[in-house]
Amino acid sequence: MLVWHPVRLIAVSLRNKTIILGAIPVVASAVALSLTEIPGTSVDLSVPYAAEGPGPTFNTLGTTGGKNVVDISGTKTYPTSGHLNMTTVSVRHGMSLPQAITRWATTNDMLVPIEQIFPANQSPEEVNKENQAAFASSENNATSAAMKYLHRPMAVTVMSQPEGFDEIRKGDIIEGIDGKKIAQPQDLVKAVRSHKVGDRVTLQVQRDGKSQDVSVPVRQGESDDAPILGITIKQEPADGTTIDYHLDDIGGPSAGLMFTLAVVDKLTPEDLTDGKFIAGTGTIDADGGVGPIGGVSHKIDAAKKAGATMFMTPSDNCAEAMSGDHDGVVLAKVNNLSDAVTALKEVKAGKEPK
């Protein structure tokens, strides 16, 4: 299973290649040793640990399954070269004791308590759902951050509305609320939450190319009783540009930075990588801020194995990144999207990124 959500690595390294296997009484067959439950029962024999290690990397400038990983249409794009690889952490769980010992002894994986992957109050399905939502959010933020960096207009668009909610329609562009401009979804959420359930607000919307005012009721949220409108909104390019992301079976927010750089590279005449193999990680917010992630040492290891010569790491992950083995890979510290683009330009010019 590949995950992207931040997880705190176990404080003590579990890597000691000298294992005294004679201290472990081995009395069962190899088949029995690999069992994770007693046959014919629901008794779980798996250890309460997961193994974390380097996962696969994906070139956000490349293709997967015959599709561009980052696919842009509706506007002029420019040729790219090289690599901007997002990196992953591979997580294995549901292991028997011998399987866990084998991974501990023969790989660079680290064992972490299973609760760090699947909290006690959440099922694997719930965690996976959260990871998928975080991944989708990273895609949306990547689009917003890239378009803002390139000074291209964005719009808050209605994606869906409750049944019977006829005041607002799918495809409406929300320009303002009660006369105040809406620049991003958070602006609308904040404005609505300043009202009480049952109030009415006036939205300034653009529908079929025409602006109009629409009065809508403030509803009560189902999960936290907070005031809401009940509509699903998304920030999209306002100039007809469409940006789609094509990676399946990946979860979590840490692909955001590399997705954003791919969008910027494809929409910029200048080739940002100059054919070089760059990898990295980091969350991205809609304003271009880069946030920390989990498993950075594993991701650097994955990048090295893939052939990267530079790795972009969030500033908050620098201490861990520097403490590990990164020989042959230049580390670039980034706080925001502008830092990341600057680092690419410095490497292109033959300089070492700051």
Model-derived regions: residue spans:
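PDZ/PDZ-like domain segments forming the peptide/carboxylate-binding groove
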Residues: 133-176, 180-183, 289-294, 315
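Terminal targeting segments of Actinobacterial cell-envelope proteins
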Residues: 1-16, 105-113
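PDZ-domain C-terminal substructure recognizer with occasional recognition of PDZ-binding tails
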Residues: 190-233, 323-349, 354
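Conserved mixed alpha/beta catalytic, RNA-binding, or beta-rich assembly cores of soluble enzyme
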Residues: 93-98, 102, 108-128, 139-140, ...
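Terminal peptide-recognition signature
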Residues: 147, 171-174, 203, 231, ...
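Extracytoplasmic low-complexity, Pro/Thr/Ser/Ala/Gly-rich segments
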Residues: 35-111, 346-354
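Hydrophobic membrane-insertion alpha-helices, especially the h-region
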Residues: 17-37
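Glycine- and Gly-Pro-enriched alpha-helical subdomains that act as flexible
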Residues: 266, 286-311
